[in-house]
A protein has these predicted regions:
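Conserved signature/switch motifs of ABC ATPase nucleotide-binding domains
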Residues: 145-146
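Helix-to-loop junction immediately C-terminal to a conserved catalytic motif
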Residues: 49
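The feature captures the beta-strand-to-loop junction immediately N-terminal to the Walker
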Residues: 34-36
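Conserved ABC nucleotide-binding domain
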Residues: 102, 106, 112-130
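Conserved ABC transporter NBD signature motif
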Residues: 56-68
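Conserved ABC ATPase "signature" C-loop
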Residues: 207-208
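Non-catalytic connector elements of ABC transporters
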Residues: 246-355
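A short, flexible loop at the N-terminus of ABC-type nucleotide-binding domains that lies
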Residues: 1-4, 8-20
Length: 355
């Protein structure tokens, strides 16, 4: 079990990568770090691995993880290959410095190469490999020796779309197998589909901040902020409205005068927001398409299981093609966010999620 106790990272020039984090990662758990470039994913992995200094404590089974280097394997984003050495040398080197004998090294190197499908390239220089095989060479290190924690940094980054898909289909089952053996797996990715496919929990990151930690279901149903919601639904809708109590229930009045019934949130909103401007947010598949505020559909196209209807800056998911569509949320589907920092103003989320 890994325990993060008040862990954060601040550089000498003052930039803080993420605020103090408390988190427990259980044996056999797969955790995805999801975020765009410069969101702090790599720094998070390096802090956990102990290869960069940080504030707070990173403990593994009660002891500092940095003092257990043999328990951790990290596949870096830059792959850290010896470009002018053979693939064989790249795999043999970490075993050699740990004192393995020649026969043992040969056996493990060839077995690891076979696992990832680069046996035919073992004696080529690493720089001669194409992009996807360089990634496979780096991944092969996971099969060289036993470990308890695997840290994998954005392994499909820089590949063409089809190559990235192919590589992930090869890597994902291996990571799942490691987890079934009780190993902890933490991987970074920019691709929400990769995160969703195998992660037990997801850490949503953005611009050096951790926006939310939770299961996919938790994040979709109760996003801590608009960014966390948009991480899985790029068309997540939000608009400014004035929050008030009317007719004995919670209501939000939009800037164009329409009222959104928020009775499902009665008693759940931080009280200081009553009478204030807020953001009302809802998922792109939660529009009341037959509702009273209609907009003309400018474009429509069929996706995998629905139509995507474009109305101005809105993209509405709908079961059928229409000429006009409602642009307010379905009853019971709207959530509320601060209109300045975009954080949730629902009291249970605010209380549960404090970084």
């Amino acid at each position: 079990m890994i325990k993060l106790d008040g862990v954060s990272k601040q550089y000498i020039y003052g930039a803080r990568v993420f605020a103090p984090v408390d988190m427990t990662i259980n044996d056999g758990e797969i955790v995805a770090l999801l975020g765009d470039e410069l969101s702090g994913k790599t720094t998070f992995l390096k802090v956990v691995a102990g290869v960069t200094d940080s504030e707070g404590k990173v403990l593994f089974d009660g002891e500092p993880l940095a003092k257990k280097p043999d328990d951790v394997i990290m596949i870096f984003d830059d792959l850290a290959l010896f470009a002018n050495r053979s693939c064989y040398y790249n795999l043999a080197y970490p075993l050699k410095i740990r004192g393995a004998n020649k026969d043992e090294i040969d056996k493990r190197v060839k077995a690891a190469a076979e696992k990832v499908g680069i046996t035919a390239s073992l004696y080529f220089k690493a720089r001669k490999l194409d992009s996807i095989d360089k990634k496979r060479l780096a991944i092969a290190r996971l099969f060289l020796r036993d470990f308890k924690v695997a840290l994998v940094d954005d392994i499909t980054r820089g590949l063409k779309k089809e190559d990235a898909k192919t590589l992930w289909q090869e890597v994902a089952p291996a990571l799942q197998d490691f987890a079934k053996e009780g190993k902890i797996v933490i991987f970074a990715t920019r691709d929400k589909d990769e995160a969703i496919s195998i992660a037990d929990r997801i850490v949503v990151t953005h611009y050096r901040q951790i926006k939310q930690i939770g299961t996919l279901e938790q994040i979709l149903q109760n996003p801590s902020n608009i960014w966390a919601a948009q991480a899985f639904d790029e068309d997540y809708a939000f608009e400014k409205a004035r929050l008030k109590i009317a007719y004995g229930k919670l209501v939000a009045t939009t800037e164009d005068g329409f009222e959104i019934d928020l009775s499902h949130l009665d008693g759940k909103v931080v009280k200081s927001y009553i009478g204030q401007d807020v953001y009302v947010g809802w998922a792109s598949d939660c529009y009341d398409v037959s509702g009273e505020r209609k907009a003309k559909v400018e474009h429509a196209y069929k996706s995998e299981n629905c139509y995507i209807l474009t109305c101005g800056n809105r993209r509405v998911k709908c079961g059928e093609k229409q000429d006009e569509v409602g642009t307010l949320p379905l009853l019971g589907k709207a959530l509320l966010f601060d209109d300045t920092n975009e954080n949730s103003i629902l009291s249970d989320i605010v209380a549960a999620y404090l970084f």
